[in-house]
């Protein structure tokens, strides 16, 4: 389903194998990640399904600045007046979302993991080659609640995938948005289950594995940047990711 309910008051919009989330809070609707350009229409559908209107969207947080997570930031700024929040180390990347380092060349992965090709094609069809960045952002530097963001999500820096990657936690609701720090579908290998993203899309795989310690233990619904939600103890998902290693 392109749009589905993943937790009470939370809808996931999925296009090109990438997830964007719409979260109902007491302070308005919060968007977590801006996906690809195709997500714009799907997020609008999710807002309507929550019985809300575009004017009710009052916040946008980005787990990181890669092109497949900032796909509609420019449109959200223009049409909704939203300025996205992102870790300060990834702020330049939001403005230039294709200009990032990765540990291994992607062409090698396409040959070695042919099952990932349909995912890559789906990303292109969802607008992966036509993402417009945004230079005006709001930033945070460390861990802690974002008081000016609806729902006051707790930012959890999880560097490795990018220098400024961060997860977001809503502890009172048991929701953990992990972006690409912890996924259940690796878009470069097509492998499923809790894991970190392959070296084709990750700057520092060792650091990415190490930073999983920042994710709080306990029961939660883990909402990743790629793949299906995962429910259970966060430490079990982290252990599974470490066992899986990095493709």
Where are these regions (language model features)?
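Short glycine/proline- and charge-enriched loop/turn segments
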Residues: 101-105, 189-199, 241-244
């Amino acid at each position: 389903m392109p749009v589905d309910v993943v937790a009470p008051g939370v809808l996931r919009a999925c296009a090109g194998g990438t997830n964007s989330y719409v979260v109902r809070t007491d302070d308005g609707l919060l968007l977590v990640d801006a996906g690809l350009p195709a997500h714009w229409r799907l997020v609008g559908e999710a807002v309507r399904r929550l019985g809300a209107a575009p004017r009710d969207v009052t916040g946008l947080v980005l787990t990181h600045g890669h092109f497949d997570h900032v796909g509609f930031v420019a449109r959200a700024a223009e049409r909704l007046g939203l300025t996205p929040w992102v870790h300060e180390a990834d702020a330049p990347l939001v403005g230039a979302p294709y200009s990032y380092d990765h540990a291994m060349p992607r062409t090698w992965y396409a040959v070695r993991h042919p099952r990932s090709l349909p995912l890559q094609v789906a990303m292109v069809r969802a607008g992966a080659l036509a993402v417009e960045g945004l230079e005006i952002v709001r930033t945070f530097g460390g861990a802690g609640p974002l008081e000016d963001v609806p729902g006051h999500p707790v930012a959890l820096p999880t560097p490795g995938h990018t220098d400024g990657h961060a997860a977001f936690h809503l502890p009172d609701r048991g929701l953990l948005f992990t972006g690409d720090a912890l996924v259940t579908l690796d878009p470069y290998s097509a492998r499923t289950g809790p894991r970190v993203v392959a070296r084709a899309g990750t700057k520092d795989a060792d650091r990415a594995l190490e930073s999983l310690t920042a994710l709080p233990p306990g029961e939660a619904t883990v909402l990743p940047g790629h793949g299906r939600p995962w429910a259970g103890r966060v430490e079990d998902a982290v252990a599974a990711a470490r066992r899986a290693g990095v493709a």
